[in-house]
């Protein structure tokens, strides 16, 4: 069966990046790594990485979306992945290697897709004021 795996082009720091991601994701598995290329798994998703010369830059056109069950998970991934990188709006961050991540609680999607448009709009308005998503504040906005 065919599979899709992200293939990441790093600018000479692939081994450092893979080691970093392996430390952040508790169930990470290193499949193989040599100085030029690595294969690893994060949360069951296979990734390939290439150690190459500076040529292509990561940008916001693609991001990795982490579904979180709890605020503790949101906090953990937000703090770990943003270390050395930067925070952005609406649950987005950029890690120290330039990759974009969306750290999003499942509850946000549930609230935004509520059939009551007024409740969903209040949740959207609250989210737009946040960098790291705060589930309690979303729930307050939802309740009115």
Predicted regions and their residues:
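Conserved beta-strand and immediately adjacent loop positions that scaffold enzyme active sites
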Residues: 5, 37, 89-90
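Terminal peptide-recognition signature
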Residues: 6, 21, 40, 81, ...
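Exposed loop/turn and edge beta-strand positions of beta-sandwich/beta-sheet ligand-binding modules
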Residues: 4, 60, 87
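Serine endopeptidase catalytic core focused on the charge-relay Asp
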Residues: 18, 41-43, 54-67, 75
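Conserved short beta-strand elements that form part of the metal-binding/catalytic scaffold
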Residues: 28-59, 102-106
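Vicinal oxygen chelate
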Residues: 14-15, 64-110, 114, 132, ...
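N-terminal beta-strand motif that seeds the catalytic metal site of vicinal oxygen chelate
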Residues: 1-19, 24-32, 63-64, 107-144
């Amino acid at each position: 069966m065919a599979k899709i795996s992200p293939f990441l082009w790093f600018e000479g720091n692939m081994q450092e990046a893979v080691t970093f991601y392996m430390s952040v994701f508790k169930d990470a598995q290193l499949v193989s790594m040599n100085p030029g290329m690595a294969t690893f798994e994060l949360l069951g998703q296979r990734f390939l990485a290439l150690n190459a010369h500076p040529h292509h830059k990561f940008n916001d056109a693609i991001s990795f979306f982490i579904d979180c069950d709890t605020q503790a998970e949101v906090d953990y991934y937000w703090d770990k992945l943003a270390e050395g990188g930067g925070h952005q709006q609406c649950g987005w961050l950029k890690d120290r290697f330039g990759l974009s991540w969306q750290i999003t609680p499942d509850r946000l999607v549930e609230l935004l897709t509520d059939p009551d448009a007024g409740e969903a709009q209040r949740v959207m308005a609250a989210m737009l004021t946040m960098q790291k998503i705060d589930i309690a504040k979303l729930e307050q906005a939802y309740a009115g």
